[in-house]
């Protein structure tokens, strides 16, 4: 084979790769309640496709932006999104349909001319977007954009449970804001709507409380970590960190745009050695206390007979109410031995 022939063959192979259409697969997790394949040719998703959202609703506009980002990330196809329905065919319509029962329910209709994702609320539309997103094949070949065929279908779905949550424990191990956002993204991908954020532990205090700076200066840090349960091996590596109130607001907003409610947890009266290390007068013995290196249940807890404890907790809750809009606030309440109270 001559060099010229080899070059032509390589060009032909590249052309065949970049123009080959992939096909969407609606067998996703969680599986929609109803998937009815319909007659008709598939919708071809390509770079001439537009995303249309005619409402000015803020969350719906976020939905349109997310869909464009998801498609670009999965397929390499970059789509524009508009607020007016374009002439002709070849667009994805995001719309609110008040006839759909259930505030998180959605419908997806795919025809040759159009894809329609409808929900009774912006949240429903968002979950429809997640289903469509997961149905797309993931591009290889360095994200070379190639058309994707969406088989004609009618999908109807709604969540079985109103509360679909995941908990992230940042008390025992601190995770950066970027990780927390990635965690929220994974929740959104699986249609979850409640982020239970565990923010205090014997091993660390993770929230900025402006009235009590020692919580960040002392309670947020430990000088080492026991490696494994029932072990005496300490790595002696400092570990810690905390989230500023501005970072918390940023995360709450990030979650809201993805239709996820952030529910904070401050564990009391047990699991409070980090708090006691910062303010030992809140314990029954007066300390000194240290931020815990090891795991398990500790006998040093908040002193329920100390009126100062209730004043401090009220101050903490008052500050957190300024950054967490959720109607729910988790106070733990588990594993609080009464040993010190009885002494």
Describe the residue ranges of each PLM region:
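N-terminal leader/propeptide and maturation segments of large enzyme subunits in energy/redox metabolism
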Residues: 334-343
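Short acidic (Asp/Glu) and glycine-rich catalytic loops that position anionic groups and cofactors
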Residues: 47, 293-297, 343
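Bacterial Sec-dependent N-terminal signal peptides
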Residues: 1-26
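A general secondary-structure junction signal
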Residues: 83, 94-96, 199-201, 266-268, ...
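Contiguous, structured surface segment used for ligand recognition
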Residues: 22-161
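Feature activates predominantly on carbohydrate-active enzymes
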Residues: 101-329
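Polar helix-capping/helix-linker motif
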Residues: 11-13, 306, 343
